[in-house]
């Protein structure tokens, strides 16, 4: 049974390469490494070659690494729940990661408590329509005269952790960085209708542990913020506490206050925007270029901001030398 109030932590993985490959601080890698090292299996979301989000099962680090990073689209579960139950009944340790509604759905499907099941859910803003994502990709391909080869929903390497910039690489060797999909996503017009009534937009979540980017870290634990990524960890019950204790050896961590960690999705669902119907009318009847300009913030001003951010970050990398902490607890 989950506690009425979670225990809250700021977390960074000790291994800098792991943190660099993660979208925030690397907590998912630490948790999944614990399960894999004991012969367990991990279920999580990956991008296919067609840039669809799907849940897969893995017992190895290579496929697990594909699960790292943000995917701002809804994953297809397929027969994942059936597979999870099969593993549980075979006494395999299972880590399932997903949105809160996916975790709740899994628990309802399996129908009883399993000591060998560990669930991680994410602090979720909501999930957008697949139509928007596919239209965005087609628009970028038309602009670049090439098929998309890879997608980074949040390019931490070039723009840092604080900024949300998507980067697409193309088969012709070119790349482009943009905030169009980010602007559409955070404008909330593209979300599924059920997301506006989500019962999990609070501090109470169905997972054993809930994870997120630690937005607000400058208040909760400013010494953690080096713009390379910090994970927010909510430990929701005894099972979550047990595994978190086991992975602490892989982490630099600090217990923080819940009141300093309250992101909007931990308070209430986002309201349905007043312009949602107009957005969808525009999307169905206008070009995506029109939609991107009206709702996605494109233009010379935005392009200049992105270029300036990239230049500043490259300069900072040249003049700042980072140091390693000796302490695991801050």
Language-model segment annotations:
Residues 1-27, 32-34, 311:
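Electropositive, gly/pro-rich neighborhoods at or near active sites that engage anionic ligands
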Residues 91-95:
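Short active-site oxyanion
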Residues 107-118, 137-142:
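Short, surface-exposed basic-aromatic patches at helix termini and helix-loop junctions that form
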Residues 38-41, 146-330:
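Long, compositionally biased charged/polar accessory segments in the mid-to-C-terminal portions
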Residues 24-26, 49, 96-106, 126-128:
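Gly/Ser/Thr-rich loops at beta-strand to alpha-helix junctions
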Residues 54-82:
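Glycine-rich phosphate-binding "P-loop"
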Residues 1-16, 50-58, 64, 216, ...:
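Non-heme iron-sulfur electron-transfer modules
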Residues 118-139:
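Short, flexible loop segments at boundaries between secondary-structure elements
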């Amino acid at each position: 049974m989950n506690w009425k109030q979670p225990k809250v932590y700021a977390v960074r993985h000790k291994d800098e390469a792991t943190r660099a490959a993660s979208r925030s601080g690397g907590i998912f890698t630490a948790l999944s490494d614990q399960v894999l090292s004991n012969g367990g299996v991990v279920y999580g979301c990956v991008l296919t070659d067609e840039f669809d989000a799907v849940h897969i099962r893995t017992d190895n680090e290579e496929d697990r690494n594909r699960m790292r990073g943000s995917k701002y689209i809804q994953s297809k579960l397929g027969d994942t729940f059936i597979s999870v139950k099969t593993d549980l009944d075979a006494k395999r340790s299972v880590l399932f990661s997903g949105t809160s509604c996916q975790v709740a759905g899994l628990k309802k499907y399996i129908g009883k408590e399993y000591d060998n099941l560990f669930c991680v859910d994410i602090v979720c803003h909501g999930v957008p329509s697949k139509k928007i994502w596919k239209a965005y990709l087609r628009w970028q391909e038309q602009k670049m005269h090439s098929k998309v080869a890879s997608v980074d929903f949040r390019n931490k390497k070039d723009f840092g952790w604080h900024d949300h910039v998507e980067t697409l690489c193309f088969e012709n060797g070119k790349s482009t960085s943009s905030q169009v999909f980010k602007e559409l996503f955070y404008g909330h017009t593209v979300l599924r209708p059920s997301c506006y009534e989500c019962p999990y937009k609070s501090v109470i979540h169905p997972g054993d542990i809930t994870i997120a980017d630690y937005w607000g870290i400058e208040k909760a634990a400013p010494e953690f913020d080096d713009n390379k990524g910090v994970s927010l960890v909510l430990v929701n019950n005894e099972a979550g506490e047990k595994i978190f204790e086991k992975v602490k050896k892989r982490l630099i961590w600090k217990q923080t206050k819940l009141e300093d960690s309250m992101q909007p999705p931990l308070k209430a669902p986002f309201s349905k925007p007043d312009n949602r119907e107009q957005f969808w009318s525009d999307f169905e009847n206008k070009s995506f270029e029109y939609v991107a300009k009206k709702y996605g913030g494109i233009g010379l001003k935005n392009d200049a901001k992105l270029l300036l951010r990239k230049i500043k970050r490259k300069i900072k990398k040249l003049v700042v030398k980072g140091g390693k902490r000796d302490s695991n607890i801050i």
